[in-house]
């Protein structure tokens, strides 16, 4: 069975976007390519044991095992050597991507304190959207009693859109709650 948002995209969102953007070919309609979750752990340079519970949290949120990111260069000011683990990331594609986006929109974002919508300025100019989350507790997969350290993450939604306006229209159709600008 396909993910709920994937079916919604095929049946409702794609035809609506095609009409809205004035495209003739359905394959030209922008779609979500992948979602990348990145958790930077600068403190892991001093104590590598901090990395394990946060990697486990990221695995629970994403539903697949994250890869640890390592430092590309040594930086003396940050006490970082080349090859030291400094974070974790996961790339979601296909059904798991749609399921994660569904959980993020319907469960995760509404649990953020003082949530008024996500920023409309976080597009990169090439149709991709990046969103910062301050703590991992907004996801129901995380057991609050087992969390030792609150850690935020970056969530990047990569689309096939050529510009920000078509990407914004795509995400709005998916139900991403953008902040109302007064």
UniProtKB/Swiss-Prot annotation:
Top-level taxon of origin? Bacteria
Which InterPro entries has this protein been placed in? Answer: Ribosomal_uL5, Ribosomal_uL5_bac-type, Ribosomal_uL5_C, Ribosomal_uL5_CS, Ribosomal_uL5_dom_sf, Ribosomal_uL5_N
Which residues form each disulfide bond in the chain? Answer: none
Q: What is the documented function of this protein?
A: This is one of the proteins that bind and probably mediate the attachment of the 5S RNA into the large ribosomal subunit, where it forms part of the central protuberance. In the 70S ribosome it contacts protein S13 of the 30S subunit (bridge B1b), connecting the 2 subunits; this bridge is implicated in subunit movement. Contacts the P site tRNA; the 5S rRNA and some of its associated proteins might help stabilize positioning of ribosome-bound tRNAs.
The record's note on quaternary structure and interaction partners says: Part of the 50S ribosomal subunit; part of the 5S rRNA/L5/L18/L25 subcomplex. Contacts the 5S rRNA and the P site tRNA. Forms a bridge to the 30S subunit in the 70S ribosome.
**Which Gene Ontology MF annotations are present?**
rRNA binding; structural constituent of ribosome; tRNA binding
| Protein name as catalogued | Large ribosomal subunit protein uL5
Q: Which GO terms describe its biological process?
A: translation
Q: Which sequence ranges form a coiled-coil region, renumbered to this chain?
A: none
Query: Which Pfam families does the protein's record reference?
Result: Ribosomal_L5 (PF00281), Ribosomal_L5_C (PF00673)
Question: One cellular component GO annotation, for this chain's record?
Answer: ribonucleoprotein complex
Q: Which UniProt keywords apply?
A: Ribonucleoprotein, Ribosomal protein, RNA-binding, rRNA-binding, tRNA-binding
Question: What protein family does this chain belong to?
Answer: Belongs to the universal ribosomal protein uL5 family.
Per the UniProt record, the source organism is Acidobacterium capsulatum (strain ATCC 51196 / DSM 11244 / BCRC 80197 / JCM 7670 / NBRC 15755 / NCIMB 13165 / 161)
